[in-house]
């Protein structure tokens, strides 16, 4: 298995991504994930990091997006991240009715 993980430099906030290549039964399986995607102040850095990440994204497909909590500096880049790509699953914190 080969894996790479990165904290993207977005300033105050969080944008963390990971990718794994798993060799199984003579095939390579690829897995992409993102944990949070937001920044508080200078969103230009966030937007640059999102576009750079999307250019490198395997098959323009995200396997899973995790959102730790709904503070603005953890979610305000999600719509830009998901624009033009597929995302198989999104995990959000439990929200009481």
Where are these regions (language model features)?
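Non-catalytic, alpha-helical, charged scaffold/linker segments
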Residues: 95-97
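Conserved beta-strand hairpin/beta-sheet module of binuclear metal-dependent hydrolase folds
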Residues: 1-52, 60
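Active-site metal-binding motif and surrounding structural segment of the metallo-beta-lactamase
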Residues: 44-92
